[in-house]
């Protein structure tokens, strides 16, 4: 083996001395020494001929213009002396190499030593996390959270009960501190909803009173263009980990504003698909979104109806704080059906126009529940009752001003591409899913 290595060494030197080969750089290799090593010699984690760096026989040594012939002669002399090199004691050579500890320090496993951290300020806690390798609060945010946080000045909302990101061993469980009353998600005396009838009809039907629908949204960003135009899937959660597909949504590529197509057919998310249920369209700034059903705005037999309007408060000055949103829905009749409102009908006003004119007779106004600032966690928190486990600027709960404890809808992140979405009366699956899609969309001037 030693003879073969020396032959290969000589061949490489001869090959590099030939015309047309790229010569080695004159930069010196100075690897930083690890503080854990007591050996004072500089080490290079190379095996084979590269271990002779720094020796007179370095194959990467700098060659001058008139040194090619000298190198050629040296190569021939080394070939002639190869037999004498075989007499070197192999055990001494192995012992010499092993004493250099030729282990790549960059590939060595890093052991994180956990140490208790005393309560401290955010700045000192940040440096402490860097020393002990603890993930920071921002590590739980995805790229959309960073974009909304840096551009819009919004702050992420943390589920209540999750420990401080600046403390060791933060728990990732929902809080049980608040009582599960009739207004809380999953409260007593409330049944979990199930699909009744056909999917296309069920997703448009308002939820019955006293029934809670627990859903899950999955974001699919795999594929050529799904990094910019992901597909979102809505499933109804059932017992024992089972789930039922309800809706799918994707952002249209060729559109002047954000435009999402929603369909109950996961294989065909297009405007002309049989499963087309409606769409979500935003204004230029991404501050206002309107939800429409599958009707045709040019038709008089089945006109397009307004299902909801989502308005995000602008934040021109960039003040830090949770994102504020207002959701306007059509009012409900005595038999728990939506009031038909169509902005496409020139004879009547749409939901947004009615809200701007303060004509609240046939519309319902919802707001996001204001998160509470927690001094211990140094973040805004909401009690999601265990349904949301990660902080995000997209986490929210919708309530009515007359009953802030009755959560109409809540939405939040549980992993990088998985979100929970729970809704109840008077929302339907289509409305709730569209509201969640508006939260995913990028917002330049929103808080």
UniProtKB/Swiss-Prot annotation:
Feature: compositional bias, Low complexity: 62-84, 168-182
GO cellular component, one term: rhabdomere
Gene3D superfamilies reported in the protein's UniProt record: Tubby Protein, Chain A
Keyword Protease tagged: no
Keyword Glycosyltransferase in record: no
Top-level taxonomic group: Eukaryota
Topological relation to the membrane, as annotated: Peripheral membrane protein
InterPro entries: Tubby-like_C (IPR025659), Tubby_C (IPR000007), Tubby_C_CS (IPR018066)
Protein localization: Cytoplasm; Nucleus; Cell projection, Cilium membrane; Cell projection, Rhabdomere
Renumbered residue ranges of the record's region Disordered: 54-84, 168-191
GO biological process: protein localization to cilium
Record-linked Pfam families: Tub (PF01167)
Keywords annotated in UniProt: Cell membrane, Cell projection, Cytoplasm, Membrane, Nucleus, Phosphoprotein
Family of this protein: Belongs to the TUB family.
Protein's name in the database: Protein king tubby
UniProt organism field: Drosophila grimshawi (Hawaiian fruit fly)
Species classification: Eukaryota, Metazoa, Ecdysozoa, Arthropoda, Hexapoda
């Amino acid at each position: 083996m030693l003879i073969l290595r020396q032959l290969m060494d000589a061949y490489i030197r001869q090959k590099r001395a030939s015309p047309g080969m790229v010569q080695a750089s004159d930069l010196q290799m100075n690897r930083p020494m690890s503080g854990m090593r007591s050996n004072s010699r500089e080490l290079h984690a190379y095996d084979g001929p590269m271990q002779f760096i720094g020796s007179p026989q370095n194959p990467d040594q700098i060659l001058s213009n008139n040194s090619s012939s000298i190198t050629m002669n040296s190569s021939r002399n080394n070939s002639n002396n190869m037999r004498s090199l075989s007499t070197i004691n192999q055990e001494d050579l192995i012992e010499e190499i092993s004493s250099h500890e030729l282990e790549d320090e960059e590939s060595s496993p890093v052991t994180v030593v956990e140490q208790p951290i005393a309560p401290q300020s955010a700045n000192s806690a940040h440096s402490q996390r860097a020393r002990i390798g603890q993930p920071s609060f921002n590590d739980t945010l995805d790229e959309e959270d960073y974009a909304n946080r840096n551009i819009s000045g919004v702050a992420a909302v943390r589920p209540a009960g999750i420990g401080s990101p600046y403390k060791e061993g933060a728990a990732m469980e929902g809080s049980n501190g608040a009582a599960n009353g009739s207004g809380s998600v999953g409260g007593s005396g409330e049944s979990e909803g199930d699909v009744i009838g056909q999917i296309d009809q069920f997703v448009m039907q308002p939820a019955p009173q006293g029934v809670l629908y627990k859903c899950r949204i999955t974001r699919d960003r795999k594929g050529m263009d799904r990094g910019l135009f992901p597909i979102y899937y809505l499933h109804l959660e059932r017992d024992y980990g089972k789930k039922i597909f309800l809706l799918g949504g994707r952002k249209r590529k060729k559109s002047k504003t954000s435009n999402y197509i929603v369909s109950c057919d996961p294989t065909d998310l297009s405007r002309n698909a049989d499963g087309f249920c409606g769409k979500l369209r935003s204004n230029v700034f991404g501050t206002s979104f309107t939800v429409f059903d599958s009707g045709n705005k040019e038709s008089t037999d089945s006109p397009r109806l307004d299902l909801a309007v989502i308005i995000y408060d602008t934040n021109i000055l960039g003040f830090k704080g949770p994102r504020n949103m207002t959701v306007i829905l059509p009012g409900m009749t005595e038999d728990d059906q939506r009031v038909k409102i169509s902005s496409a009908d020139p004879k009547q006003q749409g939901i947004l126009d009615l809200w701007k004119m303060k004509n609240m007779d046939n519309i319902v106004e919802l707001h996001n529940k204001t998160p509470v600032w927690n001094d211990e966690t140094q973040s805004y928190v909401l009690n999601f009752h265990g349904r949301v486990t990660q902080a995000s600027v997209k986490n929210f709960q919708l309530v009515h001003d007359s009953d802030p404890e009755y959560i109409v809808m809540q939405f939040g992140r549980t992993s990088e591409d998985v979100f929970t979405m729970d809704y109840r009366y008077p929302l339907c699956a289509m409305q709730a899913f569209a509201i969640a899609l508006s939260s995913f969309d990028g917002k330049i001037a929103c808080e």
